Amino acid sequence: MDAISDPTFKHARSRKQVTEESPSLLTVIIEIAPKLWTTFDEEGNEKGSIIKVLEALIVFLNAHLAFNSANKVAVIAAYSQGIKYLYPESTSALKASESENKTRSDLKIINSDMYRRFRNVDETLVEEIYKLFELEKKQIEQNSQRSTLAGAMSAGLTYVNRISKESVTTSLKSRLLVLTCGSGSSKDEIFQYIPIMNCIFSATKMKCPIDVVKIGGSKESTFLQQTTDATNGVYLHVESTEGLIQYLATAMFIDPSLRPIIVKPNHGSVDFRTSCYLTGRVVAVGFICSVCLCVLSIIPPGNKCPACDSQFDEHVIAKLKRKPVVPRLKAKKKVTKP
């Protein structure tokens, strides 16, 4: 029996070892301007929609951490006066929180028996969002409410680049998720086109897909749809906050490596128009600066590019300002018969 069985075991090929799944970094950009969500509540006859979004976001982050013990998350808030890293906290924020007399027991609404990683993320988010809401109360009466979503996206890609360079031993898959709210007025005029295009170029080079979840408002968002289309991301429009966690758990958990072979829940048509640097209007045909590729719907005053301050050629400007000339048709001469 030994003579029969030994060669079998000697020549048997060993099975391939199952490789562990590479960890993933999920960076979430959430827009929490109070006036934006107040307008959304008034249009949809809802109440406390931002709280429902935050609850769904916390469950979504916990689910991402549960997939792999090496997974990482980061949350950046875009509010009316700037951006703020909610998680992980910066070193200066940690020192400031330690020096304060208030402890986390004042805001401790998380179950103490929860998994440690879940509890750390949940408690930090609840505390930082509470501080941010208190800060926004003082600024709510100001009329200047600008969108800082483009800056938050740029900061998120910067964080992804830094974390990817730090993890040299293991390959880290990264993706960006943008949670924004739509109102009755078009928000494309508020967005800055050039910063968003810079984010698209950076994400494409880093191979970091950008997913967008737009809650309420119009289904179309020109620049955000262009962002998801160029970076192989998912654009999802949700009418209300009801069932948001189900949308996040189904559409936003698609692995980047599987997206080329999976039908993504995107809209069929994408508007690839750009916006004018001066007026902010979305245009299909316009003037382009040959130096910085700035798009203009009108000829700028002074014949200078408003973005790079390049001087345009006077002969070219004269040709552009020249109105089309319609040639007159020559009257046919009547031929008289003899």
UniProtKB/Swiss-Prot annotation:
GO CC annotation, single: transcription factor TFIIH holo complex
Coiled-coil segments on the chain, per record: none
InterPro entries in the cross-refs: TFIIH_Tfb4/GTF2H3, vWFA_dom_sf
GO molecular function: zinc ion binding
Residue spans, zinc finger C4-type: 289-308
Source domain of life: Eukaryota
Cellular localization per UniProt: Nucleus
Lineage: Eukaryota, Fungi, Dikarya, Ascomycota, Saccharomycotina
Modified residues (N-acetylmethionine): 1
Family (UniProt): Belongs to the TFB4 family.
SS bond partners: none
Keyword Cell inner membrane: no
Broad class of the protein's primary localization: nucleus
Xref: NCBIfam families: tfb4 (TIGR00627)
Protein name: General transcription and DNA repair factor IIH subunit TFB4
Role, per record: Component of the general transcription and DNA repair factor IIH (TFIIH) core complex, which is involved in general and transcription-coupled nucleotide excision repair (NER) of damaged DNA and, when complexed to TFIIK, in RNA transcription by RNA polymerase II. In NER, TFIIH acts by opening DNA around the lesion to allow the excision of the damaged oligonucleotide and its replacement by a new DNA fragment. In transcription, TFIIH has an essential role in transcription initiation.
Subunit details: Component of the 7-subunit TFIIH core complex composed of XPB/SSL2, XPD/RAD3, SSL1, TFB1, TFB2, TFB4 and TFB5, which is active in NER. The core complex associates with the 3-subunit CTD-kinase module TFIIK composed of CCL1, KIN28 and TFB3 to form the 10-subunit holoenzyme (holo-TFIIH) active in transcription. An additionnal subunit, TFB6, plays a role in the dissociation of the SSL2 helicase from TFIIH after transcription initiation.
One of the protein's GO biological processes: regulation of DNA-templated transcription
